[in-house]
Amino acid sequence: MTDVLVVLKVFPDSDEVNLDNLYTDISSKLPKEYKIIRKETEPIAFGLNALILYVQMPEQTEGGTDNLEEVVNNIQGVSHAEVVGITRLGF
């Protein structure tokens, strides 16, 4: 079974949200077969930054990336999360 790499942009609900704590919350609530490979921050506007997560997950996940977005969107401090890219890993 092949995995995919999902690029997920997470928007905090305010500029007071600590992105390191948000990352910790997200990584602890992801299903065990999901793995965060890399994290970055991206300036949005007026001192607000988005968290960019590169998440490795099984390709044959039921519902595709919807489950990932749902889990992250239900975390306190998240305004919303959206998939901005996806690529298949391996052959």
UniProtKB/Swiss-Prot annotation:
<dbReference type="Pfam" id="PF00736">
    <property type="entry name" value="EF1_GNE"/>
</dbReference>
<dbReference type="InterPro" id="IPR014717">
    <property type="entry name" value="Transl_elong_EF1B/ribsomal_bS6"/>
</dbReference>
<dbReference type="InterPro" id="IPR014038">
    <property type="entry name" value="EF1B_bsu/dsu_GNE"/>
</dbReference>
<dbReference type="InterPro" id="IPR036219">
    <property type="entry name" value="eEF-1beta-like_sf"/>
</dbReference>
<dbReference type="GO" id="GO:0003746">
    <property type="term" value="F:translation elongation factor activity"/>
</dbReference>
<comment type="similarity">
    <text>Belongs to the EF-1-beta/EF-1-delta family.</text>
</comment>
<protein>
    <recommendedName>
        <fullName>Elongation factor 1-beta</fullName>
    </recommendedName>
</protein>
<comment type="function">
    <text>Promotes the exchange of GDP for GTP in EF-1-alpha/GDP, thus allowing the regeneration of EF-1-alpha/GTP that could then be used to form the ternary complex EF-1-alpha/GTP/AAtRNA.</text>
</comment>
<dbReference type="InterPro" id="IPR004542">
    <property type="entry name" value="Transl_elong_EF1B_B_arc"/>
</dbReference>
<keyword id="KW-0648">Protein biosynthesis</keyword>
<keyword id="KW-0251">Elongation factor</keyword>
<comment type="subunit">
    <text>Homodimer.</text>
</comment>
